[in-house]
Amino acid sequence: MRRGIGIQAAQKQTQTQKQLQNVSEQLNTENINKIKEQLLVFKENLEIFATKHKKDIIKNPEFRKYFQDMCNMIGVDPLASNKGFWCQVLGVGDFYYTLGVQIIEICLKYRSSNGGLMEMDTLAEHLRKLRGKNSQEISCDDIECSISKLKVLGNGFNIIKVSGGKKLVQSVPCELNKDHTDIIILAQDNNASITQSLVISKLKWSEERINNVINFLLQESMIWIDEQSNETIYWFPSLWSNFSFE
């Protein structure tokens, strides 16, 4: 008798679990549908907002960044295609793709001098000169947005964060590991240069580890050698502030 009660209890428990699972699946489906409806409404409102504030989005970099952030919230990419609503209303696709071409042009022009590394602010300055005074104003956010689209071309373009909130634009198809970026950050804090003794003192690295990084950076033409002092100095021209290679 007890065994029968046990079987009935187990069956009832299984049935209850199935009912709870069905209710859970139903709730999940309803929640997903509600979220989809909300996103659709948000997208429609975003299109109305874009139409209403078209001039501000096109002319004001900060407003354009705000608009881009709103798009990212709902997974809308106004730069994904040169066709469709966003490009027709705002022309943002053409704007960022044109900016991307100009970024490539400048990075290629100075690659032999800086080894494919350039400070973001320096790149922005070159872009403003190239575009002219009467062109649409750009910001570093615009540059980052364009570079994110250039990644479809491969690993040639990347953004490296260094100390002091500064950023470097990498335009060479090589992968920089943590050792490479640690050296760059150290150089950025030391007037754009490093020495072997400085690296040993600050990073506690072995000579072999230092030489491996230096040889790689030399091979990629990212650093220059200065042997005029008692100890060899390695300079990063990409970190020289307000330096022009023209």
From Swiss-Prot:
A GO term from the CC aspect: ESCRT II complex
Pfam families, alphabetized: EAP30
Main localisation: cytoplasm
The entry's keywords: Coiled coil, Cytoplasm, Endosome, Membrane, Protein transport, Transport
Subcellular location: Cytoplasm; Endosome membrane
GO biological process entries: protein targeting; protein transport to vacuole involved in ubiquitin-dependent protein catabolic process via the multivesicular body sorting pathway
InterPro entries: ESCRT-2_cplx_Snf8, Snf8/Vps36, WH-like_DNA-bd_sf, WH_DNA-bd_sf
Coiled-coil intervals: 8-34
Source superkingdom: Eukaryota
Task of the protein: Component of the endosomal sorting complex required for transport II (ESCRT-II), which is required for multivesicular body (MVB) formation and sorting of endosomal cargo proteins into MVBs. The MVB pathway mediates delivery of transmembrane proteins into the lumen of the lysosome for degradation.
Subunit and partners: Component of the endosomal sorting complex required for transport II (ESCRT-II).
Protein name from the UniProt record: Vacuolar-sorting protein SNF8
Species in which this protein is naturally found: Dictyostelium discoideum (Social amoeba)
Gene that this polypeptide is encoded by: snf8
